[in-house]
Curated annotation (Swiss-Prot):
This protein's name: Putative AraC-like transcription regulator
Coiled-coil segments on the chain, per record: none
Keyword annotations from UniProtKB, A to Z: DNA-binding, Transcription, Transcription regulation
Matching SMART domains: HTH_ARAC (SM00342)
Transcription regulation found in the keyword field: yes
Length: 303
């Protein structure tokens, strides 16, 4: 697996689609801070997105989509002066999967959220800006538009297993949005995600994820990436925020935590599978990173 696939798999990324929103005239719907990674896409018309904490609204045109990566309240509206309706109440009145606001049907949005099985905020979301906006006219956005169109068709025509198909398509859309954001705005991400935008760092990350149990050295990674040891160390630290071996330790602990949450393998076997020579060596590293020993974590795994 590559690093992005690895992390999304570790997080057990799942999508959940909400009712669609049809709106017209002057309207505004205010939403509480979402506890998931929220997304919406404008399939018809145009509107404004105003996120709590941001001074300026975002113009959403037909075909645009966005992700909200922080738990902030937000408003979708025709204009900033329109009287807002409570989103919970609006969607509680939804019929046949469609909520309505204002008068008419000038605007049509689909949306939902992504949930994760473990601490996604630290592993993924904190490395993204609070709002990821993908305009329809963005170069190379065809894959995002294809996924959104396919979701729209599943929700509109509702063939067999349409909800399941649409939710899987939403995960496909998320991956394409993340790829596109890395390509067009590499300076707007941080951590390992930023590393994927640097070919040298991305090469090292790929090797680390491909074989985390290997006894990697910085020199060996540098050779694999075809740069000097000092170049790799400096670029990795500057981009990811920690050195290659520090990153490897953290990733090994994440893999260990997953095995402790989901399986019953003895700690010695887990240690061997993630590159530690002994159970005690893994225990020391685990406690240093997560603040508790593996045995306690297995009994009381952290969210």
């Amino acid at each position: 697996m590559d690093p992005l696939e690895d992390v999304l798999t570790l997080l057990k990324t799942r999508s959940h689609l909400s009712a669609s929103l049809v709106a017209g005239g002057r309207w505004a719907v205010v939403f509480d801070a979402p506890q998931v990674l929220k997304f919406n896409a404008v399939r018809r018309g145009a509107c404004l997105l105003k996120v709590d904490g941001d001074d300026e609204p975002i113009d959403l045109a037909e075909g645009d989509c966005y992700l909200l990566t922080r738990p902030r309240s937000f408003t979708l509206c025709s204009d900033l002066e329109a009287a807002p309706s409570d989103g919970g109440a609006v969607f509680a009145r939804a019929e046949d999967g469609i909520a309505r606001a204002g008068q008419g049907d000038d605007v049509f949005l689909i949306g939902g959220g992504f949930s994760f099985a473990t601490h996604a905020q630290e592993l993924l979301l904190d490395n993204l800006p609070p709002v990821v906006h993908v305009p329809a006219g963005t170069p190379h956005a065809e894959a995002v538009q294809w996924a959104l169109t396919a979701i729209d068709q599943e929700l509109t025509h509702q063939p067999m297993a349409s909800t399941l198909v649409a939710e899987h398509l939403a995960v496909v859309m998320l991956i394409h949005v993340l790829r596109l954001h890395l390509e067009r705005a590499p300076d707007a991400v941080s951590g390992w995600l930023a590393g994927l935008a640097d070919p040298v760092v991305a090469s090292a990350l790929t090797f680390l994820h491909r074989d985390p149990a290997h006894s990697w050295t910085v020199a060996e990674l540098a050779s694999a990436a075809a740069v000097s040891r000092s170049t790799l160390a400096a670029r990795f630290k500057a981009t990811v925020g920690q050195g290659p071996l520090e990153y490897l330790t953290r990733w090994r602990i994440e893999l260990t935590a997953r095995q402790l949450r989901e399986g019953s393998a003895p700690l010695a076997a887990i240690a061997h599978s993630v590159g530690y020579g002994s159970e005690s060596a893994l225990s020391v590293a685990f406690k240093r990173v997560l603040g508790m020993n593996p045995g306690d974590y297995r009994k009381h795994p952290m969210p």
